[in-house]
Design a protein with these regions (language model features):
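Glycine-rich beta-alpha junction loops
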Residues: 5, 30-34, 56-63, 118, ...
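Aromatic-lined glycan-binding groove of carbohydrate-active enzymes
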Residues: 37-76, 110
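Terminal-tail/helix-coil boundary detector
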Residues: 47, 75-106, 121-125, 133-135, ...
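Glycine/proline-rich, positively charged
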Residues: 1-36, 40
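Structural preference for beta-strand elements that scaffold enzyme active sites
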Residues: 22-27, 49-53, 126-129
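Conserved, mostly hydrophobic/aromatic
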Residues: 26, 45, 52-55, 100, ...
Length: 176
């Protein structure tokens, strides 16, 4: 299942269980600036013992160096058919991204590497789905696997900086 609320996840789990079907994976959107699953879905995932594959760990590209200065002409935010609406690229969100980039640099990572490392460092996350447009992006993103741990002080700074940027474009749970 993908992007269901905690309540709906529990309902689906019960329906599947009544039919002897195991629910293996929940696939929510999750990133440093899209943390809606932390409200209650992570508790449900743990309780039901299902995997969590986070998609959009780079928040549709916002957690890359692409948006550090402005909206590039060739980007998801400039594409009118994209899920990433320009209205989500607010001054507040850009400030958060800029501050996170400074933390990443101190860690010796790019912003995208730190964002992926952070998602994967959460013990309720089984894996992360990354989307790349080039071999270079793939190589850079895979480097995040070389530095998955965070110190307590890094986590404190990141959590203080990375507030939910309200960019969850899948906010509305799927209906069935």
């Amino acid at each position: 299942i993908s992007s269901y609320s905690s309540k709906k996840t529990n309902q689906i789990y019960k329906i599947l269980k009544s039919r002897n079907i195991k629910l293996f994976i929940h696939q929510p959107s999750y990133s440093l600036i899209n943390r809606w699953i932390e409200k209650d879905l992570t508790k449900t995932i743990r309780k039901l013992k299902i995997g969590c594959i986070a998609f959009s760990p780079l928040a549709q590209g916002m957690l890359s160096d692409k948006y550090l200065k402005k909206i590039p002409k060739v980007s998801r935010a400039s594409d009118t058919t994209s899920y990433l609406d320009k209205s989500l690229i607010t001054k507040k969100n850009l400030k958060i991204v800029s501050d996170l980039n400074k933390i990443a640099i101190k860690r010796g990572q790019s912003l995208s590497q730190m964002a992926i490392s952070w998602v994967l460092s959460n013990n309720y996350v089984t894996s992360a789905l990354i989307g790349v447009r080039s071999l270079n992006q793939l190589k850079e993103n895979l480097e995040s696997l070389n530095k998955l741990s965070f110190s307590a002080s890094e986590m404190k700074i990141i959590n203080k900086t990375a507030k939910d940027g309200n960019i969850n474009i899948w906010k509305q749970s799927s209906s069935y």
